[in-house]
């Protein structure tokens, strides 16, 4: 019932330096994804990126309160719970980003007057949290069988003061970076669905191109993990 | 008759205009609404500004108070923004705790302040480890007709430029702060971030400065905050239809022109205010 898949995704070959696990080029951390691990939600997934881990659960399509119902589409709701403390304004802002990204891909018109709820719980945060939340949400929506027009993935990149780009930064790299950009890209045409940036920078094209290249690896990982899960059963 | 069509099929009504490359209020796709700004209207606040972007009206008031700095940043002051969308501005907001829209806008403004380094927090320090200034920036929307983020960013910038802080000295004998209200100085504003918002229609068309109705019909929004050197402080795209890299570049060039327009307007207003 559970499927665990691991993969190492690399964009360029590493130089094999011992001190930092990744060279100054672009490579993503180790990914892992586990689906269908919770019994109550209709779909659930746990996504691991290096040491960052997020657990997502999806309930839906389910009944919706009359005050919240939309006559021709499903109402999407996202709840993000931080690891410690009560959810605050920053969580609300992230929930809005994730919700709008999901609304762009989920075929809500197939389930009018219903609600689809995505609940995300941060298990550990070691950098690239928003990207990991997006990936977990996508895998959980797939596990729940919610119809979507495309898959989406989150990629984070950090620009440090001398202009080098680091994909999937750790918390330390994020703190030292001049800017941290998180993008959500769709699987069909690699278009930009969501972008959230922190810091001052000027070169979006380079970051976006790098993120699009990285997203290929993430989508390949999705495909492999789902293939492995369904080929056994 | 047109009003009937508009009520029944608002999207089709809108598409008819877009086909002719214009909008119902007569603007072109890349044109902003008339922007007016009034600085220093609230005498009880340390700095204030009222910005009108067409019908959207936002007023920003800045109050400066004393606070003790936190132990891990003993020489840094605080800038605390808060965006309030009261039921006065639009029928979609109810009274009570801030709704999602207000919280998202507050977080956006906090991010812009943090990312653009508009004020160096060290400038707000009076006595390291003991006393710092905290600037409470309250942004209240008086009329909501779309594009609230642009109006809030502009109002905040104009209000901060208007803030005058009195000179404070710490008396060594009593260890109390003495405020000299006669000697006031302006804040050191290092950068001028200006926000430009776009709405995406039917996954392809981009229009600038959406009104309330346009925002409702749009399939996505995008806000770019730029400073004068062309650096981006914030690329805020909360989901919605996808955009290609080329479209993004068009938006950035539009944001650069908007920055020049806004900066010119603000400089004119401040110059006209100086002899007081």
Swiss-Prot record, chain B:
SUPFAM superfamilies xrefs: Ribonuclease PH domain 2-like, Ribosomal protein S5 domain 2-like
Record's subcellular location: Cytoplasm; Nucleus; Nucleus, Nucleolus
Protein family: Belongs to the RNase PH family.
Membrane-spanning ranges: none
Noted disease: Pontocerebellar hypoplasia 1C: A severe autosomal recessive neurodegenerative disease characterized by cerebellar and corpus callosum hypoplasia, abnormal myelination of the central nervous system, and spinal motor neuron disease. Affected individuals manifest failure to thrive, severe muscle weakness, spasticity and psychomotor retardation. Vision and hearing are impaired.
Protein name: Exosome complex component RRP43
Chief subcellular location: cytoplasm
Function: Non-catalytic component of the RNA exosome complex which has 3'->5' exoribonuclease activity and participates in a multitude of cellular RNA processing and degradation events. In the nucleus, the RNA exosome complex is involved in proper maturation of stable RNA species such as rRNA, snRNA and snoRNA, in the elimination of RNA processing by-products and non-coding 'pervasive' transcripts, such as antisense RNA species and promoter-upstream transcripts (PROMPTs), and of mRNAs with processing defects, thereby limiting or excluding their export to the cytoplasm.
Natural source organism: Homo sapiens
Gene Ontology biological process: exonucleolytic trimming to generate mature 3'-end of 5.8S rRNA from tricistronic rRNA transcript (SSU-rRNA, 5.8S rRNA, LSU-rRNA); nuclear mRNA surveillance; nuclear polyadenylation-dependent rRNA catabolic process; RNA catabolic process; RNA processing; rRNA catabolic process; TRAMP-dependent tRNA surveillance pathway; U1 snRNA 3'-end processing
Domain of life of the native organism: Eukaryota
């Amino acid at each position: 019932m559970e499927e665990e898949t691991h993969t190492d995704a690399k964009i360029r070959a590493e130089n094999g330096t011992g001190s930092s696990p990744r060279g100054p080029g672009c490579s993503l951390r180790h990914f892992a994804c586990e689906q269908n691990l919770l019994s109550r939600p209709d779909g659930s997934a746990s996504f691991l990126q290096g040491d960052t881990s997020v657990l997502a659960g999806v309930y839906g399509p389910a009944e919706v309160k009359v005050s919240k119902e939309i006559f021709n589409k499903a109402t999407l709701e996202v709840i993000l719970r931080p690891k410690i403390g009560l959810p605050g304004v920053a969580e609300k802002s992230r929930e809005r980003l994730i919700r709008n990204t999901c609304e762009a891909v989920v075929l809500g018109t197939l389930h009018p007057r219903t609600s689809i709820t995505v609940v995300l719980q941060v298990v550990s945060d070691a950098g690239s949290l928003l990207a990991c939340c997006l990936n977990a949400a996508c895998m959980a929506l797939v596990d729940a069988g919610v119809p979507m027009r495309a898959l989406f993935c989150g990629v984070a990149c950090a620009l440090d003061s001398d202009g080098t780009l680091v994909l999937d930064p750790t918390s330390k790299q994020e703190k030292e970076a001049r800017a941290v950009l998180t993008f959500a890209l769709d699987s069909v045409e690699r278009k930009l669905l969501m972008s959230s940036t922190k810091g001052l920078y000027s070169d979006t094209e380079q970051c976006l191109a790098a993120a699009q290249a990285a997203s290929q690896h993430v989508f390949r990982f999705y495909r492999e993990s789902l293939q492995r899960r369904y080929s056994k059963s | 008759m047109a009003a009937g069509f508009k009520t029944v099929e608002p999207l089709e009504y809108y598409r008819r205009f877009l086909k002719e490359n214009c909008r119902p209020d007569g603007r072109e796709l890349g044109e902003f609404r008339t922007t007016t700004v009034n600085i220093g209207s609230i005498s009880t606040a340390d700095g204030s500004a009222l910005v009108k972007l067409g019908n959207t009206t936002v007023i920003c008031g800045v109050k400066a108070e004393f606070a003790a700095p936190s132990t891990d940043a003993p020489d840094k002051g605080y800038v605390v923004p808060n965006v309030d969308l009261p039921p006065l501005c639009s029928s979609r907001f109810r009274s009570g705790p801030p709704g999602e829209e207000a919280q998202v806008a507050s977080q956006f403004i906090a991010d812009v302040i943090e990312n653009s380094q508009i004020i160096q927090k060290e400038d707000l320090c009076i006595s390291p480890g003991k006393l710092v200034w905290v600037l409470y920036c309250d942004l209240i929307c008086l009329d909501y007709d779309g594009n609230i983020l642009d109006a809030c960013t502009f109002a905040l910038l104009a209000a901060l430029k208007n803030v005058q802080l009195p000179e404070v000295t710490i008396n060594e004998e009593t260890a109390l702060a003495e405020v000299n209200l006669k000697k006031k100085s302006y804040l050191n504003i290092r950068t001028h971030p200006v926000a430009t918002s776009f709405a995406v229609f039917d996954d392809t068309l981009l229009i600038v400065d959406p009104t309330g109705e346009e925002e409702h019909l749009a399939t996505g929004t995008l806000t770019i905050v730029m400073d004068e050197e062309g650096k981006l402080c914030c690329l805020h795209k909360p989901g919605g239809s996808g955009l290609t890299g080329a479209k993004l570049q068009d938006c950035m060039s539009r944001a650069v022109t908007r920055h020049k327009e806004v900066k010119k307007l603000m400089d004119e207003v401040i110059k006209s205010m100086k002899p007081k």
